[in-house]
Curated annotation (Swiss-Prot):
Organism superkingdom: Eukaryota
Chain intervals with Basic and acidic residues compositional bias: 211-227
WD repeats: 4-45, 124-163, 279-318, 323-363
Subcellular location, record wording: Nucleus, Nucleolus
The name this protein goes by in its record: WD repeat-containing protein JIP5
Length: 489
């Protein structure tokens, strides 16, 4: 379903509340339109899809009757205009009470969701036109501009003209293309045995640290034994929670047109507050996360999807998925294994990442580039170089096939689509990779304990020679079957 707008759209965002069906759209005229799509969700799924083009053999009466009775499944609540310049980006706050928007005149605005009135404004606070805006929580907002500068704002300090941000990062030299805040980004794993062999001093330091850690554990154990019996039962749980918290971290992941990706710690400042990847020799345009933030998918100008693993560090990608004929300008996560890609050729594709496979096309913008996409539950909203926003029903992809028999469930492949065969080759690869990582960690422990013995090094060297044999995995040759949801591909 296409919702007409007064001018071309530049960005859009869904309301964060699950029971509130609101969509905010930022226009090139500087206006913000708030749209309610309750009727779209309550209508049957058959009426959400566009009508098929009439054939030459169809009668004129049937065509005219279909055109004369259009179904309006949306309501425009209000139109607000914080600035006369174009609205280059907008995003709901974490609670949905306000809408943060950025304009070409280097300003930031906060608009009340209920009334559409501007509550706070930060006038001319950027050196260049801002390109992205992202609220981190109810009081902190992050913006990125065309010069590659990332700024952190505190809403509690109020707005005004020329106000300075709380923190600022200038390690990028080209425009900020996309940002995502991950509260549970995995911590990089320790170095492998091969890297540990390069320096004997590192082994000594690690062995000394291990001894100090054991002493601290023994000291803590003695303290726990002296405490009362009622506190002894609660302390192990608190220790487990602390151990779990150490395994993850909160970071802002930023992609830039300079070909690099960076991880920013918003709670600190200085040169140690961010990590920047190597030059990817291509513009990074979009980013999304899958598998509970253990994998990052980045879209590039050349149409290649690059995969990043935070547990291995964010200095470089670990894999690449080619196949798009044009640039991937926007990305949306569908499930743990699948993403939706919006390309400059006007098509919205369903791409399975693990294993990599093109599942089909679910929407088209008639050859015009897909600039932005957002997804909420079973609704996908996308905009291109037109004065309309397209709503696509994702229920066929997310359907669990509860009404179908067990035979259909057995034949259903990825995303529950009948006719798409499952491919577990990548799962096997991941299991093998995990086994290899576990083997490397075990070898590291063996070498640390036996660093003073010459025989221990010889045994670990033999184990390292056997590791490449365990990494050989036969690639799967499975292909998607015909007759599924995307039978025309």
């Amino acid at each position: 379903m296409d919702i007409p707008l007064s001018s071309d759209a530049l960005d859009l965002c869904f309301h964060p509340a699950a029971e509130t069906n609101l969509l905010a759209v930022g226009l090139i005229s500087g206006k913000i339109q708030l749209i309610n799509y309750d009727d779209y969700l309550s209508s049957p799924s058959s009426s959400r899809t566009p009508l098929a083009p009439p054939s030459k053999k169809s009668k004129p009466s049937t065509i005219s009757s279909a055109v004369e009775t259009p179904t309006k499944l949306y309501r425009k609540l209000y139109t607000s205009r914080p600035s006369k310049k174009s609205c280059r980006g907008l995003h709901f706050s974490t609670t949905g009470s306000s809408i943060f928007s950025i304009s070409k005149d280097k300003s930031l605005f906060s608009t009340d969701t209920q009334t559409g009135k501007v509550v706070q404004s930060w006038i001319e606070v950027h050196d260049a036109a801002p390109s992205r805006v992202l609220p981190v929580d109810e009081s902190l907002v992050v913006t990125g501009d065309d010069d590659g500068v990332v700024r952190l704002w505190d809403v509690r300090k109020g707005g005004g003209k020329g106000i300075k941000p709380v923190r600022m990062w200038e390690h990028h030299f080209d425009w900020i293309t996309d940002m995502v805040y991950l509260a549970d980004l995995p911590v990089p794993k320790p170095k492998s045995i091969k890297e540990a062999k390069k320096s004997k001093t590192q082994l000594k330091k690690q062995r000394r640290r291990a001894r100090q850690a054991e002493r601290l554990k023994e000291h803590d154990k003695e303290k726990r034994e002296q405490n009362a019996s009622d506190t002894e039962a609660s302390e192990p749980d608190s220790e487990d929670d602390a151990a779990i918290k150490v395994e993850s971290r909160s970071r802002l992941i930023v992609t830039s047109g300079d070909g690099s990706l960076s991880s920013i710690d918003l709670l600190s400042s200085g040169p140690t507050s961010f990590e920047q990847s190597e030059d990817q020799e291509d513009e990074l345009l979009s980013i999304t996360s899958i598998r509970s933030s253990t994998k990052l998918v980045v879209g590039t100008q050349l149409g290649i999807l690059s995969l990043w693993t935070p547990s291995r560090g964010l200095l470089d990608h670990v894999d690449r998925v080619p196949g798009h004929p044009a640039s991937v300008d926007t990305l949306v996560t569908l499930d743990n294994e699948t993403v939706l890609t919006g390309s400059s050729d006007g098509l919205v594709r369903v791409v399975q990442i693990l294993p990599s496979k093109l599942l089909g096309v679910i929407a088209s913008h008639n050859g015009l580039p897909v600039e932005r996409m957002k997804r909420k539950q079973s609704v996908l909203a996308s905009i291109g170089h037109t004065n309309a926003v397209k709503l696509t029903d994702l229920s066929p992809l997310l359907d669990d096939n509860d009404d179908q028999g067990d035979d259909d469930d057995e034949q259903a492949g990825a995303l529950g689509i009948v006719g798409l065969a499952e491919d577990d080759s990548d799962d096997d690869d991941d299991d093998d990779d995990d086994d290899d990582d576990d083997d490397d960690e075990k070898h590291l422990v063996v070498e640390l304990d036996g660093a003073e013995q010459t025989d221990g090094d010889a045994e670990s060297g033999q184990d390292d020679e056997q590791d490449p044999d365990s990494e050989d995995v036969t690639p799967s040759q499975n292909k998607a079957g015909k007759g599924g949801f995307f039978s025309d591909l």
